[in-house]
Structures are given as C-alpha cells and as structure tokens.
Design a protein with these regions (language model features):
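C-terminal tail/sorting-segment detector
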Residues: 3, 465-466, 499-516
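Beta-strand-rich modules
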Residues: 431-451
Length: 516
C-alpha cells in the first residue's frame, strides 16, 4: 500500500471554487475537459434514509471529525443491480452520485470514482474542471493509508431495510494522485425514515401569534383543536414546519424530537433543551451549551392567549445530538390582537454602544426595539417608527454623512436599512454614527388610526456608561473570540464546530459551542 500524503487544502481552497452545479453559465463555457462526475439523478427507484456517519473535514489546517446525525441519505436502485449514493461526503457538498453494485444483500462501491469538480479559469480565460476522486482510506495506528490494493468499501442491506457499512475504513476525497484532502466519511449507516410532520385538523381554530426570543420576533400560526396546539412557521426557512403541544390546564407541553422536515442536507427536528455546562472528554474542556430534555413546558394564559417558558427549544439538525441552526431561549408567544387605538410602545433596550473615536471615525449603537406596548400586547412593525437623540437633541441624518440616504431623515421605519450604516435583524437594530457625542437616546413611536403615541426616550450615557445599567444590567459585550475545538484561535467566519467566547463589561466570560 502507498503511504498516504496528507495534503492540507484549506476549506477556502475547496469551498471557494465555484462548483459546476452552482455556475451553469460557466459550465456551458467550459471547453477543455468533459465532466466526469454523475451530476444528474440516475434512473431508478429513489429512497431517502436517515443517515449517520463519522465525518472528517479540514478546519483551517486542523483535521477534525464529528458525529454526523440526521443527514438526508438519498439512494437510487436501478434495474441493473446498480446502487447510487448522493452526496456521500457530509462535510463537502459535492452534488454527485457515487455508483455501487449490489450482489445479494451486499453493495460494493469500487474506487476511484470522480466525486467532486471545481470550475477554474486558466491564463487564457478558458474554463476547465479540476476533478477530485473518492478513494478508500484505511484507518490504523499510524494514521491513514490509501488502500490501492482493495480500493472499495462494502455496505450490507439488513433485514429491516437499513444499509450499514462493513468495517470502519473511510471513503475519502482525494486528488488525482491519490493524496487525501482531509474530507471523508466512515461508519456509514442508512436507516429507513418515514416520519411525518404534524398537521392541524381542518376544523382547528387558527390565529396569528408572535413568537419572541432574544431579538427574534416571528409571526406564527397557532391552531387549537381540543387539547392539541399546533404552531407553524417556527422556522422562517421552513414554513411547513409544525410543532404540536398538549394543553393541560394552564400548561402546554411540547415533546422533543418532533420532525419538522428537510432543511438543506439534514432532517430538522424540534428539540427541547436547557442551558448548562458540558464537559468534553475528548479535549478535557468545559463549555456552555444546550442540553437536550424530554419536553419544553410553557405557562399558558388562556384568557390573554399567551405562552411563556423559562426553557428553550431548538431547530435541530438530526435528533441524537444537539446541533442546531436556530435556538429560541426563554421563548414567549402572544396572540396578535386587532388594534383599536394607538397605545404606548415599550422603550428601546440598548445592547451595546461603541463610543465615537477619531482614530476609527465612527461609533456604533446596537439596540432592540420591542414589538409590544406597555400592556404587553403585540404591535405590528408597520405601526412603529423610531428617532435618535444626540446629546438630548433630535438628530437629523442626511446624505452628507450617510451616503446611502437620498434625503434628510429624522424618523425611521421599524425595518428600515440602508445596508451600510443602518441594519436590522429581527428586533435588533445597529446604527453607526459619526458624531462625537456624550449621550444617545432612542424614542419609539406607535401610529394607528391617525394618532401617534410615543415611548419614553431611553438614553445611554457614553461617558459614564450608566444608561446601559438601567436597561440591561452588566451585559454589555466587550469582546468576542473564536477557537476550534482543538483550541486554536480562528476567525469569526470559519466554518465548522467552534467555541465562541464572549467577554462582558464586568470581566465575566461565556463560552458556547456554535456550528457554522
């Protein structure tokens, strides 16, 4: 066997290249090399499985492996005893099918097979493909070796219909010389999957509610039939996703691991959780993250139609591990009443303020604008505007300082953004300013039926930083850093499993695990 050279290619080197799937115009123009991957779904019977594996990937120069759970395993069986596996590499989306042959209940995937293509431009402005290949890599005490003598893996079709890899060798992504690129999967396991999304009966009473958590404010539909409550649109990317709860008096219980649908390459699940400290024995380190629970329980105010919980739920990839895209911590849901008059809105809540400095030439204010009035009733963002006050005076903003503005403005719509100095993310608003000021204030205005009602002006004192204490305690963030799980510091844009450390004004820190 040839000893495998571990060719370190960063995630940017592979991920930064345009794939043939992503650039149709460039594919049409390519003229120096025919395509070799199987990019179109082959003819035959398509089956979808719940896939698990161990996935290896290059985390900016660090070889990293993770347990992959809930991957959508697409497999095609044709009438010539051939079996095709789609996107067999969990950590590099290759838009390709690998072919195997089935004999009895054994599927054998012979390699090398073209598995990944990047589209490149040569010095003569001609497009060409660089092709990467699937090969078998053996894992042993010395590391990894390319198995050129028995370059295949086998999977067994079990009596229950599952497809399970034999042995623990890796199907790896290599260059044309057989050098491993630090992407691959082993312990492939395809389980039959037939879960369905809960559906509210047509006879259920359906109303619009608002789902709040942190700076998130999502409009959802709540349907009630008997002792069942159905909540849809909990994932903005998956409007079909529905979670079902059981009403028990003044409580509503939502069980964990409810199927929500496919989200990209993964099956998505509703997972209940609580925040806590977790020990990672692989790296002898503690970090804070969510711990899975059996259910999330909401307090239910039936008269005012409100739900509130001190726990959390996650929109999770897979159901075995905590691996989430969106988390709703301490969520609340409120019925959206039809307004009859303008009411006093809640005031702004400052998150952080960076004072203006001459060296940078700018300052930054981050604040939340609640979509509620002082009575706790939901307000539509379309009714809300806000104004900023610099050193106690209403500030007018114009194109002289804000190049993306086309006119002078002193009042902004709730969702206004110029995508340069003014940004909005849910209820969180970020505003860059170019004045050397001592205080900054925010006033919220609720307008309905031709009448406007204003909130109190919430002021942040940049000199003493007392304003933030009145609003958010000592939670001002002063720094954020990222490391990979091997302990190496990385940039905020790094893909993979990272540890995010947040440093607060009082010197305290909080470390969480994030997936990008």
């Amino acid at each position: 066997m040839k000893k495998l050279l571990l060719t370190i290619i960063s995630s940017l080197a592979l991920g930064g290249m345009a794939t043939a799937q992503q650039t149709d115009a460039a594919v049409a123009a390519a003229d120096t090399q025919p395509r070799k991957i199987i990019s179109q779904q082959p003819d035959g019977e398509l089956k979808e499985y719940y896939r698990t594996s161990t996935g290896y990937y290059n985390n900016f120069g660090t070889l990293t492996h993770v347990d992959v759970d809930g991957y959508v395993g697409k497999v095609v069986f044709d009438d010539r005893k051939r079996v095709y596996f789609y996107n067999i590499f969990s950590k590099v989306y290759n838009y390709a099918w690998l072919r195997g042959n089935i004999d009895g209940n054994i599927i054998r995937i012979d390699m090398p097979q073209a598995a990944y293509e990047t589209l490149n431009l040569d010095e003569n402005d001609r497009y060409y493909y660089t092709v990467y290949y699937a090969n078998k890599v053996k894992v042993n005490d010395d590391g990894f070796e390319l198995d050129s003598e028995k370059n295949y893996i086998e999977l067994e079709v079990m009596e229950d219909g599952s497809i399970v890899q034999r042995g623990d060798d890796m199907i790896a992504l290599c260059d044309e010389n057989g050098d491993w690129l630090w992407y691959g999967d082993t312990h492939l396991n395809y389980q039959p999957f037939d879960s369905t999304i809960p559906t509210a009966p047509k006879t259920a009473v359906t109303e619009e509610w608002k789902l709040f958590s942190g700076n998130m404010a999502e409009t959802v539909n709540v349907s009630i039939e008997g002792d069942r409550m159905y909540v849809d649109h909990i994932n903005p990317e998956m409007p079909e996703a529905v979670a079902m709860g059981v009403i028990e008096g003044d409580k509503v219980r939502f069980a964990t691991d409810q199927y929500l649908g496919q989200n990209g390459a993964y099956y998505s699940f509703f997972k209940s959780a609580v925040w806590g400290e977790i020990y990672d024995d692989r790296y002898d380190t503690y970090y804070e993250d969510y711990k899975a629970t059996d259910e999330i329980v909401f307090d239910y105010d039936t008269a005012r139609k409100r739900l509130k919980s001190s726990e959390a739920f996650l929109l999770n990839y897979g159901k075995s591990d905590v691996f989430y895209k969106i988390d709703y911590d301490k969520p609340s849901l409120k019925f959206i009443k039809t307004p009859t008059e303008a009411t006093k809105p809640l005031g702004a809540e400052f998150v952080s303020v960076t004072p203006y400095s001459q060296s940078k030439g700018w300052g930054e204010a981050v604040f939340n604008l609640p979509q509620e009035d002082v009575n706790g009733d939901v307000l539509s963002p379309s009714q809300l505007t806000y104004q900023l006050y610099f050193d106690g005076e209403l500030k007018s903003f114009g194109p002289d300082q804000y190049e993306r503005l086309v006119r002078e403005m002193d009042t902004f719509g709730y969702n206004f953004t110029d995508d340069w100095d003014i940004f909005v993310d849910g209820s969180k608003h970020t505003f860059y300013f170019y004045d050397d000021i001592n205080t900054i204030g925010v006033k919220v205005i609720n307008t309905f039926g031709g009448k406007s009602v204003e909130s109190d002006i919430v002021t942040y004192d940049l000199a003493t930083q007392t304003g933030i204490d009145d609003v958010a305690g000592s939670s001002r963030v002063t720094g954020v850093s990222y490391t990979n799980i091997a302990g190496c510091r990385v940039g905020a844009g790094t893909k993979g499993i990272l540890l995010k450390t947040v440093t607060y004004q009082d010197g305290s820190t909080r470390t969480v695990k994030v997936a990008r």
